[in-house]
């Protein structure tokens, strides 16, 4: 097979997005639009990908890194001009796949079929087209009586008969590189917009005796994203694809329409995802878990057999057989080890909770290390901030912390120690000790009756 390279047009600003960011870096299911297109091209067999950048080039380059080459279109003078900017990176011969960076729904399967058809038919240009019930706004593919592609006509230039054609041009092509180079030398900007159109290059190749063909693709794949509404539509389609992929791999998703899973999330088999769940970033969920309802997990690892209910987990690691929630908040850089319980209205911040420990309810643990089999009583907190710096609390194994305890950091609690309820601990507690730091109770008998007599109650 001839060498295949790709050129992705990603220089436009996207005015209808009404954004300070270039259109193609807006995300669909957690991944920038242009990255979806790059990956589709690579999976379709492209040996090299050239991305034409313009507005916000630094942001596009930051998103894609060094996995692609960049051509710079300083002034946006049309699709043909954009391809001209990439010409220096093209090999002398072979095939070039020309794509647009705002079509995140295009799949590698469709691109492979496009390339295979191009080769099998011996075409010089093969257009990816689609059939739209309402083709308004798109260029039309005009065929002769034998079904051969005659031309692409823009809607503004189409006759009434041509406007009734429902086969539209997606703006994506496979082109013979040698023929493309020759055509680019011939195209002009002699039009109302003063731009160089790639469709003119297609017409020039045809007039040079080149063979033009078209492959009809799925309409949802070629829809470009030019507005926030179209972005949300693309997100909906991609979300459906992602959810279906997980279900095909053995994950139960109770209500796919209310479940939001990013592109790079991994989920083990026999895990159940309940409604209202949001899984983002590079999150990894193990097997036999139950996630949700109404939970959000971002860039975190969750082990096997875990339950996360009505809770948020951010950039943290969770072991096996851990119960989280309802209404818990696991903040970044936390490590929750195996068989731990994090209960309702608990916040864990940048802390390690070792195996078998329980933080059942109404507790704040920040900048702390909890040993194995620790029990944190209701309302106990680590007092980690002195107004300027954060300090560490270290709790040993098998420690029992009573209710409403303040552990004022920096402080260490030895193994097997007990902390009496209501205590404010400001000094280290030795191993095996009982620490009590509270006022002694005083009962004043008859106090109420006396106050009543004096009219004070």
Curated annotation (Swiss-Prot):
Cofactor dependence = Mg(2+)
The record's subcellular locations are: Cytoplasm
Entry-linked InterPro entries = Bifunctional_GlmU (IPR005882), GlmU-like (IPR050065), GlmU/GlgC-like_hexapep (IPR056818), GlmU_C_LbH (IPR038009), Hexapep (IPR001451), Hexapep_transf_CS (IPR018357), NTP_transferase_dom (IPR005835), Nucleotide-diphossugar_trans (IPR029044)
| Annotated binding of acetyl-CoA, by residue | 384-385, 421, 438
Highest taxon of the lineage: Bacteria
Key word Cytoplasm present: yes
Residue positions binding UDP-N-acetyl-alpha-D-glucosamine: 9-12, 23, 73, 78-79, 139, 154, 169, 226, 331, 349, 364, 375
Residues that bind Mg(2+), according to the entry?
A: 102, 226
Q: What is its EC number?
A: 2.7.7.23, 2.3.1.157
Q: Which reaction does it catalyse?
A: alpha-D-glucosamine 1-phosphate + acetyl-CoA = N-acetyl-alpha-D-glucosamine 1-phosphate + CoA + H(+); N-acetyl-alpha-D-glucosamine 1-phosphate + UTP + H(+) = UDP-N-acetyl-alpha-D-glucosamine + diphosphate
Could you list this entry's UniProt keywords, alphabetically sorted. Acyltransferase, Cell shape, Cell wall biogenesis/degradation, Cytoplasm, Magnesium, Metal-binding, Multifunctional enzyme, Nucleotidyltransferase, Peptidoglycan synthesis, Repeat, Transferase
Q: Name one GO cellular component term.
A: cytoplasm
- Which species is this UniProt entry from? Caldanaerobacter subterraneus subsp. tengcongensis (strain DSM 15242 / JCM 11007 / NBRC 100824 / MB4)
UniProt region (N-acetyltransferase), positions on chain: 250-457
Q: Which GO terms describe its biological process?
A: cell morphogenesis; cell wall organization; lipid A biosynthetic process; peptidoglycan biosynthetic process; regulation of cell shape; UDP-N-acetylglucosamine biosynthetic process
GO molecular function list? glucosamine-1-phosphate N-acetyltransferase activity; magnesium ion binding; UDP-N-acetylglucosamine diphosphorylase activity
Name the chain's protein.
Bifunctional protein GlmU
Cofactor note as given: Binds 1 Mg(2+) ion per subunit.
In this chain, the stretch annotated as Pyrophosphorylase covers 1-228
Functional description taken from the UniProt entry? Catalyzes the last two sequential reactions in the de novo biosynthetic pathway for UDP-N-acetylglucosamine (UDP-GlcNAc). The C-terminal domain catalyzes the transfer of acetyl group from acetyl coenzyme A to glucosamine-1-phosphate (GlcN-1-P) to produce N-acetylglucosamine-1-phosphate (GlcNAc-1-P), which is converted into UDP-GlcNAc by the transfer of uridine 5-monophosphate (from uridine 5-triphosphate), a reaction catalyzed by the N-terminal domain.
Q: How does it assemble?
A: Homotrimer.
Pathway(s) where this gene product acts: Nucleotide-sugar biosynthesis; UDP-N-acetyl-alpha-D-glucosamine biosynthesis; N-acetyl-alpha-D-glucosamine 1-phosphate from alpha-D-glucosamine 6-phosphate (route II): step 2/2; Nucleotide-sugar biosynthesis; UDP-N-acetyl-alpha-D-glucosamine biosynthesis; UDP-N-acetyl-alpha-D-glucosamine from N-acetyl-alpha-D-glucosamine 1-phosphate: step 1/1; Bacterial outer membrane biogenesis; LPS lipid A biosynthesis
The active site of this protein is located at 361 (proton acceptor)
The cross-references to SUPFAM superfamilies, in alphabetical order and at most eight, read:
Nucleotide-diphospho-sugar transferases (SSF53448), Trimeric LpxA-like enzymes (SSF51161)
Q: Which family does it belong to?
A: In the N-terminal section; belongs to the N-acetylglucosamine-1-phosphate uridyltransferase family.
Upper taxonomic classification of the species? Bacteria, Bacillati, Bacillota, Clostridia, Thermoanaerobacterales
């Amino acid at each position: 097979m001839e060498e295949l390279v790709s050129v992705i047009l990603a220089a436009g600003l996207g005015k209808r997005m009404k954004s300070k960011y270039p259109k193609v870096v807006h995300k669909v299911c957690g991944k920038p639009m242009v990255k979806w297109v790059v990956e589709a091209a690579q999976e379709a067999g492209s040996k090299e990908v050239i991305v034409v950048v313009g507005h916000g080039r630094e942001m596009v380059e930051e998103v894609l890194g060094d996995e692609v080459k960049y051509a710079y279109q300083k002034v946006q003078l049309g699709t043909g001009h954009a391809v001209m900017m990439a010409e220096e990176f093209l090999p002398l011969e072979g095939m070039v796949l020309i794509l647009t960076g705002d079509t995140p729904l295009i799949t590698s399967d469709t691109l492979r079929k496009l390339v295979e058809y191009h080769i099998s038919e011996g075409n010089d240009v093969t257009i990816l087209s689609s059939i739209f019930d309402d083709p308004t706004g798109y260029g039309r593919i005009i065929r002769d009586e034998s079904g051969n592609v005659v031309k692409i006509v823009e809607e503004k230039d189409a006759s009434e008969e041509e406007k009734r054609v429902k086969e539209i041009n997606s703006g994506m092509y496979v082109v013979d590189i040698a023929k493309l180079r020759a055509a680019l030398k011939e195209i002009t900007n002699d039009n109302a917009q003063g731009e160089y159109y790639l469709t003119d290059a297609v017409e020039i190749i045809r007039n040079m005796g080149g063979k033009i063909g078209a492959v009809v693709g799925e309409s949802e794949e070629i829809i470009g994203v030019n507005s926030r509404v179209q972005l949300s539509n693309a997100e909906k389609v991609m979300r459906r694809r992602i959810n279906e992929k997980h279900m095909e791999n053995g994950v139960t998703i109770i209500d796919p329409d209310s479940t939001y899973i990013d592109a790079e999330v991994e989920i083990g088999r026999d895990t159940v995802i309940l409604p209202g769940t949001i899984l983002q970033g590079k999150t990894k969920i193990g097997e036999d878990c139950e996630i949700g309802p109404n939970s959000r997990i971002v860039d975190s690892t969750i082990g096997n057999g875990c339950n996360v209910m009505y809770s948020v987990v951010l950039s943290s690691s969770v072991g096996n057989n851990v119960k989280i929630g309802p209404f818990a908040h696991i903040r970044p850089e936390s490590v929750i080890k195996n068989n731990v319980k994090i209960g309702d209205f608990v916040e864990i911040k940048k802390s390690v909770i070792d195996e078998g420990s329980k933080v059942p309810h109404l507790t704040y643990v920040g900048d702390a290390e909890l040993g194995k089999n620790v029990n944190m009583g209701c309302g106990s907190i680590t007092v980690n901030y002195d107004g300027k710096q954060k300090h560490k609390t270290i709790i040993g194994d098998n420690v029992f912390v009573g209710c409403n305890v303040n552990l004022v950091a920096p402080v260490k609690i030895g193994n097997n120690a007990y902390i009496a309820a209501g205590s404010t601990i400001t000094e280290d507690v030795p191993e095996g000790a009982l620490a009590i730091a509270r006022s002694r109770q005083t009962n004043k008998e008859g106090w109420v009756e006396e106050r009543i007599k004096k009219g004070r109650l």
